[in-house]
């Protein structure tokens, strides 16, 4: 399907495909800064190589220098733009970069500048211009420049600039060319094979690309191959250019218009049509085509006859190409050929392990151009730098004795042919006879005398008789034996004699410096290249390590490998060739004290850097690669040497094998369990005595023996036997991976080991670890409690046997894999299992050991991330020095884990505890922790930068912030830059979380409760109280008050420091970043950003003003108002209100508020019942001179309820979401007023006449009626119930009551007071009372004559509170009294256009008046407004705080008298009763 799209996709599909592919490629490059830097260095290496190959005396012209400088400046400016988050600066740098890069992009590709092809510079410029247009979000131009890059220089674009993109866009079209090349290559190689009828060789198609065949070619054959390679590369380039132009035309052609013809799809034609369809899979490096190494510059033409030798010499020190290929090509990512169903090919591919296939050909081969063509050279030296269990390579193993070094071409040809036949037979045979072990009659001497021919003795493990052997295991255990010492420094390497002789590397009096050991100063005899890239003599570096050193002598980088890698054979061959041409210098600089062959001894090669129990590196689970590498190096085929001190003699091997046979027979055939158990003990003893001899291990690795040992594990109950069986299996697995595969092939084997582990056999953890189970297997058996037990308990030592890995280390490695696998729920569940098994204290204690320390930190980190509550447990027990030591000595990955661990650890619920840990981190260690963190921050990947920045900032703020601190500046800059990463929302979210945790409000469960704390400040304390109740943060039974006071002071001080540093960094740049985050479409991010912004603005006004307040207001005010208007979340609205409250204290904010006053005022009215802050803002808005308060008023009639059948609505009262109305016929109705339209829930008729008055106090309702009774009611959610009836013998016209007494008005003058038990008392002041109001022990009576009497209820005395101006005409009366917030509102007849007055009860004076020409009969007051009802059916509305009239409501019934008036508590609804028996409901929006 990879190529079918050529015929299926129309132009729109192609444009969509290009957009997706190129955009993804460019996006990946922009994300990966390290890759861009490495790519620039590699291109610079090619430029430097070209410069070095030219004439040293040639002077580069100034114009050429300027062009190269423009390219460099353009790339630099582009990189600065990528790293800049200020948009103005970014755009300016992008403009500058475009100008610089366009200079090189427009160069004539057919010319050169300073020896560099213009096409190379132009393609490089187009690549960077593609980056540039992607940053400008112009996809069209981005794709155009990317395609232009392939048009200008398809070759170098394919190998240097964009190999991944070439693979996606062009490779699917090249299948016919690749097929042609493969067929031609096949034809040439068949001429090389001595016996072309050897079908076993042709069975493996990849062998035709093996350079061992190239090295055996004759000159005329090599010339043909070179021309083929050249023609193949040219075909790929031409067709790449052809398709790039086609893609470009598709992008520029408008499919919806007929103005431009639709481009025609090109066809990639090979130079010659293949005769047959290709049915084989092709290695990736073949599809990729010829490659020119960076160090070769741009020299596609031949330089000398010995270019191949130069190329080989280059490979000793260069590993860039392999790294590139590994990152681009998969192990078997092939073109889908015409015949996709070829079963032979599939079986053959499946029989070879993918990792080993990758190691043989794909990453390890180059195609080097020389004399106009290419040949491939193996990068075996690179494998030595990164050891791995590679498949046997013909370039590494065949060796000849010194007496066979004669440069006789016939002999060489013969030897190569024999070797090829032997190799083909190894590949052909599915099973190999184990004659070595069953009949140990072959000796080293016999092999030496067999015509000095190279023989391959197989030591291959079977799984079962019907199973096909895996090729990687077969090759991994091959032993190559020859007839003499294997010291490579003796006499050359035979296979290289087919190549031209090496030219002299040095014309001086000294050998090349690459041939000399920097420690001994002598020419290498046995060179080993360490992981740092430095090469040393094996004995010298072993002595260096034996003295206790753990770092590279030159680079001082720590060495993680536990044993030395293999010999650098490529360098060794170069040295041998140089010695032949410079015998005198070789003799002078050779180490005469080093015996010949001594460095080849396995006792020298395989000495581990750690003890036997420390064979693994920092952790036994070091990604399993170190373990495999260690096993591969320890059991290398070094037993072929004849040195008597290196391995057991052959006679000893035969003796041990003969001794093993009866016990093996018992183990595999006997049904007597004790006999089998005894056999196991004997086998273990003999295995130990063999001193890890590979032949003995091979003999014991048969599937039948493995199955016998597993049966013992299943059947035996003897712990010693079980542990010994595990020891044997562990040793065998350590030697041979096929043993592990044999065990893994049967699920019950793993189940058996899991059962043993659960039953308390600690050693079972070691075997489980060596089997490398997947997460699903571990999870299914629930091994965590058992693993914790292994770590906790002291393991029993095997008497005479030493395990390859400590079971505790293995258990920790398995525990780490279990905790890091699965989804978030699984990780949380597994972490809880570790905590519940009491594993935390043991793991913390285990940190004291160096082995497994990284895994322990990783496990503890997983526990803290999954279960935040365990942080305190870890913090109280941990010693931080081991973690800091691990950070200082570890690689980037380990450092990242340590930083994440420390960052999580300081997120405790007490600030004092956090500060103590921070002090420990700061003061521990021999190095400056803060400086180390700073250095790591500057090179750490993005996922770790936030953690180290947070940690570094907290360490810096332990002391009072100084005026300037590089640590603080770098940390804050990192956090703020992360907030600008709008294309990476995860990074923004992590930055917000880090900043919220920096504030310090953290619960005992490890969560930030800054939001709840801010809501509490705003008056909405329900979330905070609920959190405190659940978390019990406010309850510290064992803490002293002084301690909690210290904690409070520490937290307040910390908040001020954090707020000061964040707000004042670069003049409030964080507020600009938060402004962008608040615009995010992610609700979670916007919420976190709002919390942080609210906290910062709240703290900002507690700090001295440094000019940042204005920046914060300009950045956040509009966003906060937008949240207030548009958000549907109550908490968000309250947070926005709190932030707005801090801004309104600044007078400059008032003008901005005027624009939004009307829209936010309504929202604030709804919020005032939840937040007192809303009330404060409303007051500010109402007091703004520029705001017309009448514009803020809005109301709407909701419903009119017709109750005329019950007569007039004489009284109403609002209580707990219910409205109660009293009617003329004695009915009391209870309404559910929680919704906009009230609903009757109860109707009572216990009064026989009109209910004239209703009032409430507490949970009691009091009703007065003309039937001469006062009734007391209980109020419930479903209605009212009468509990007392008082017959007072006279009609009640007005009533005010509470639980102590009742005051009522009857027909006479004065007022009567009834204490519920005695007879009513009359307080007569010779005036008719029209209204009553009670406040404490004072009763206020609105009387005729426009006066107010005050009655002292404790003494039953009265006095005049207010006497109004009387008029000669008409009666003036106080019709209604209301007490609200210590103010007495008195309304009645209009006198001098004033119908109401407001009195301060504390000052007993008039503080305001209500101006209207109408008499007011009823009054209602809520928190915002005063409502006054008149007898003509209108309601006048005033602002309660300013006594300013804002509106007038006209009743629908015309001039109907308003008889009752009431508003709800929230001030959102108004209920009006009238004389026509109707109730109108108004919504006050």
UniProtKB/Swiss-Prot annotation:
Pathway: Protein modification; protein ubiquitination
Catalytic activity: S-ubiquitinyl-[E2 ubiquitin-conjugating enzyme]-L-cysteine + [acceptor protein]-L-lysine = [E2 ubiquitin-conjugating enzyme]-L-cysteine + N(6)-ubiquitinyl-[acceptor protein]-L-lysine
GO molecular function per UniProt: ubiquitin-protein transferase activity
This enzyme's EC code(s): 2.3.2.27
One Pfam assignment: ARM_LIN_2nd
Biased composition (Acidic residues): 337-353
Ranges of residues in domain U-box: 510-585
Induction data: By rhizobial infection. In roots, expression increases up to fivefold at 3-7 days post-inoculation (dpi), with further increase at 12 dpi.
UniProt keywords, alphabetically: Nodulation, Repeat, Transferase, WD repeat
One GO biological process term: protein ubiquitination
Domain of life: Eukaryota
Ranges: WD repeats: 1204-1241, 1246-1283, 1409-1448, 1454-1485
Tissue expression per record: Expressed in roots and nodules, and at very low levels in calli and seedling shoots.
Matching PROSITE patterns: U_BOX, WD_REPEATS_1, WD_REPEATS_2, WD_REPEATS_REGION
Function: Putative E3 ubiquitin-protein ligase involved in the rhizobial infection process. Plays an important role in the early steps of infection thread formation and in growth and differentiation of nodules.
PANTHER family tied to this protein: RING-TYPE E3 UBIQUITIN TRANSFERASE
Record protein name field: Putative E3 ubiquitin-protein ligase LIN-1
């Amino acid at each position: 399907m990879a190529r079918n799209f050529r015929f299926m996709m129309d132009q729109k599909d192609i444009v969509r495909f290009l957009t997706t592919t190129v955009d993804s490629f460019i996006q990946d490059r922009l994300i990966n800064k390290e890759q861009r830097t490495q790519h620039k260095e590699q291109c610079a290496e090619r430029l430097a190589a070209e410069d070095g190959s030219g004439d040293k005396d040639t002077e580069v012209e100034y114009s050429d220098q300027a062009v190269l400088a423009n390219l460099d400046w353009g790339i630099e400016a582009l990189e600065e733009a990528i790293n800049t988050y200020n948009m103005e600066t970014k755009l300016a740098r992008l403009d500058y970069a475009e100008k610089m890069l366009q200079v090189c992009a427009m160069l004539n590709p057919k010319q050169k500048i300073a020896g560099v092809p213009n096409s190379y510079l132009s393609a490089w410029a187009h690549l960077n211009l593609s980056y540039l247009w992607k940053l400008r979000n112009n996809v069209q131009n981005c794709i155009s420049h990317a395609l232009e890059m392939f048009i200008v220089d398809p070759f170098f674009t394919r190998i240097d600039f964009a190999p991944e993109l070439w693979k996606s866009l062009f490779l699917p079209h090249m299948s016919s060319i690749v097929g042609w090349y493969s067929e031609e290559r096949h034809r040439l190689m068949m001429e090389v094979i001595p016996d072309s009828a050897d079908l076993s060789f042709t069975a493996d198609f990849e062998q035709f690309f093996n350079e061992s065949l190239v090295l055996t070619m004759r000159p005329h054959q090599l010339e043909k191959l070179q021309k083929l390679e050249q023609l193949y590369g040219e075909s790929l380039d031409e067709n790449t250019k052809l398709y790039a132009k086609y893609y470009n035309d598709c992008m520029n052609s408008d499919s919806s218009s007929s103005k431009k013809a639709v481009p025609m799809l090109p066809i990639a034609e090979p130079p010659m049509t293949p005769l047959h369809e290709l049915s084989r899979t092709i290695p990736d490096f073949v599809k990729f085509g010829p490659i020119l190494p960076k160090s070769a510059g741009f020299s596609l033409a031949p330089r000398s006859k010995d270019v191949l030798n130069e190329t080989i010499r280059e490979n000793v020190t260069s590993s860039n190409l392999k790294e590139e290929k590994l990152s681009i090509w998969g192990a078997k990512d092939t073109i889908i050929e015409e015949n996709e169903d070829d079963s032979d090919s599939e079986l053959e591919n499946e029989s070879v392990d993918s990792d080993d296939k990758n190691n043989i050909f794909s990453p390890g081969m180059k195609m080097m151009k020389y004399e106009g063509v290419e040949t491939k050279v193996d990068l075996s030296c690179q494998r030595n730098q990164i050891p791995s269990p590679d498949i046997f390579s013909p370039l590494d193993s065949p060796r000849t004795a010194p007496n066979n070094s004669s440069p006789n071409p016939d002999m060489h040809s013969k030897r190569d042919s024999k070797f090829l036949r032997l190799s083909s037979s190894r590949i052909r045979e599915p099973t190999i006879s184990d004659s070595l072990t069953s009949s140990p009659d072959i000796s080293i001497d016999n092999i030496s005398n067999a015509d000095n021919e190279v023989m391959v003795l197989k030591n291959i493990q079977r799984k079962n008789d019907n199973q096909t052997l895996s090729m990687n295991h077969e090759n991994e255990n091959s032993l190559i034996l020859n007839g003499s010492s294997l010291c490579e420094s003796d006499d050359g390497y035979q296979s290289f004699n087919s190549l031209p002789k090496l030219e002299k590397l040095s014309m001086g009096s000294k050998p090349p410096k690459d041939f000399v050991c920097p420690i001994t100063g002598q020419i290498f005899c046995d060179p080993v290249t360490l992981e740092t890239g430095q090469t040393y003599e094996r004995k010298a570096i072993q002595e260096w390590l034996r003295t206790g050193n753990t770092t590279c002598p030159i680079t001082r980088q720590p060495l993680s490998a536990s044993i030395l890698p293999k010999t650098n054979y490529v360098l060794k061959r170069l040295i041998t060739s140089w010695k032949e041409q410079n015998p005198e210098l070789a003799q002078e600089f050779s180490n005469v004290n080093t015996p010949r062959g001594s460095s080849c001894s396995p006792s020298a090669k395989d000495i581990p850097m750690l003890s036997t129990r420390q064979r693994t590196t920092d952790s036994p689970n070091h990604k399993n690669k170190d373990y495999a590498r260690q096993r591969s190096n320890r059991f290398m085929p070094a037993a072929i040497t004849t040195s008597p001190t290196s391995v057991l003699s052959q006679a000893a091997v035969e003796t041990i094998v003969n001794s093993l046979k009866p016990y093996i027979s018992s183990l595999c055939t006997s049904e007597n369990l004790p006999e089998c158990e005894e056999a196991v003990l004997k086998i273990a003893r003999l295995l130990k005595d063999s001193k890890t001899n590979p032949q003995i291990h091979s003999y014991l690795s048969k599937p039948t023996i493995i199955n016998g040992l597993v049966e013992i594990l299943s059947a035996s109950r003897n712990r010693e036997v079980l542990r010994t069986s595990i020891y044997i299996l562990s040793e065998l697995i350590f030697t041979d991976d096929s043993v592990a595969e044999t065990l893994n092939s049967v699920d019950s084997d793993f189940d058996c080991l899991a059962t043993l582990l659960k039953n308390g056999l600690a050693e079972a953890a070691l075997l489980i670890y060596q089997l490398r189970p997947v997460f699903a297997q571990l999870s299914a058996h629930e091994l965590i409690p058992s693993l914790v037990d292994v770590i906790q308990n002291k393991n029993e030592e095997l008497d005479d046997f030493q395990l390859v890995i400590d079971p505790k280390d293995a258990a920790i490695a398995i525990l780490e894999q279990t905790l890091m696998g699965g989804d978030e729920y699984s990780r949380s569940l597994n972490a809880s299992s570790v905590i519940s098994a009491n594993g935390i204290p043991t793991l913390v204690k285990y940190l004291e050991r160096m082995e497994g320390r990284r895994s322990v930190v990783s496990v503890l980190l997983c526990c803290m991330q999954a279960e935040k509550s365990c942080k305190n447990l870890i913090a109280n027990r941990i010693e931080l020095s081991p973690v800091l030591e691990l950070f200082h000595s570890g690689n980037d990955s380990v450092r990242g884990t340590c930083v994440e661990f420390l960052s999580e650890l300081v997120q405790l619920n007490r600030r004092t505890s956090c500060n103590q840990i921070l002090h420990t981190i700061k003061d521990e260690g021999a190095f400056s922790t803060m400086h180390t963190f700073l250095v790591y921050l500057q090179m750490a990947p993005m996922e770790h930068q936030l953690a180290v920045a947070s940690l570094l900032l907290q360490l810096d703020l332990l002391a009072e912030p100084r005026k300037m601190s590089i640590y603080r500046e770098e940390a804050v800059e990192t956090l703020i830059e992360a907030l600008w990463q709008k294309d990476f929302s995860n990074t923004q979210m992590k930055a917000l979380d880090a900043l919220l945790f920096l504030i310090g409000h953290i619960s005992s469960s490890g969560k930030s409760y800054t939001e709840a704390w801010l809501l509490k400040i705003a008056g909405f304390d329900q979330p905070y109280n609920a959190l405190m109740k659940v978390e019990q943060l406010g309850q510290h039974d064992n803490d002293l008050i002084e301690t909690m006071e210290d904690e409070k002071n520490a937290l307040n001080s910390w908040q001020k420091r954090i707020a000061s540093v964040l707000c004042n960094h670069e003049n409030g740049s964080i507020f600009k970043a938060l402004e962008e985050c608040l615009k995010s479409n992610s609700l979670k991010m916007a919420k976190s950003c709002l919390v942080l912004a609210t906290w910062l603005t709240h703290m900002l006004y507690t700090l001295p003003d440094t000019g940042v307040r204005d920046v914060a207001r300009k950045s956040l005010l509009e966003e906060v108002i937008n949240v207030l208007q548009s958000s549907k979340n109550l908490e968000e609205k309250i947070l926005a209100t709190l932030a707005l409250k801090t801004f309104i204290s600044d007078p400059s904010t008032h003008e901005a508020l005027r624009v939004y006053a009307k829209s936010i005022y309504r929202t604030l009215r709804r919020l005032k019942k939840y937040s007192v802050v809303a009330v404060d803002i409303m007051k500010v808005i109402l007091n703004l001179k520029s705001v017309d308060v009448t514009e803020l008023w809005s109301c709407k009639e909701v419903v009119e309820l017709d109750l005329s059948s019950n007569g007039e609505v004489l009284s109403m009262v609002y209580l707990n979401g219910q409205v109660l109305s009293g009617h003329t016929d004695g009915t009391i109705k209870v309404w559910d007023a929680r919704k906009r339209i009230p609903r009757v829930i109860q109707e009572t008729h216990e009064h026989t006449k009109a209910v004239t008055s209703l009032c409430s106090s507490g949970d009691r309702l009091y009703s007065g009626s003309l039937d001469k009774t006062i009734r007391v009611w209980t109020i419930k959610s479903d209605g009212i119930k009468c509990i007392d009836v008082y017959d007072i013998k006279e009609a009640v016209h007005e009533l005010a009551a509470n639980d102590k007494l009742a005051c009522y008005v009857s027909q006479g003058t004065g007022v009567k007071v009834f204490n519920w038990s005695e007879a009513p008392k009359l307080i007569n002041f010779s005036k008719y009372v029209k209204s009553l109001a009670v406040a404490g022990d004072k009763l206020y009576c609105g009387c005729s004559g426009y006066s107010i009497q005050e009655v002292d209820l404790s003494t039953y005395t009265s006095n005049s509170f207010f006497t109004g101006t009387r008029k000669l005409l008409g009666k003036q009366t106080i019709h209604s009294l209301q007490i609200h917030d210590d103010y007495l509102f008195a309304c009645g007849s209009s006198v001098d256009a004033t119908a109401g007055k407001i009195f301060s009860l504390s000052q007993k004076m008039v503080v305001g008046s209500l101006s209207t020409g109408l008499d007011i009969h009823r009054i209602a007051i809520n928190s915002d407004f005063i409502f006054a009802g008149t007898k003509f059916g209108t309601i006048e509305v005033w602002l309660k705080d300013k006594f300013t009239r804002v509106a007038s409501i006209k009743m629908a019934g015309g001039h109907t008298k308003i008889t009752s008036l009431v508003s709800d508590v929230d001030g959102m609804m108004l209920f009006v009763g009238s004389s026509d028996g109707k109730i109108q409901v108004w919504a006050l929006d």
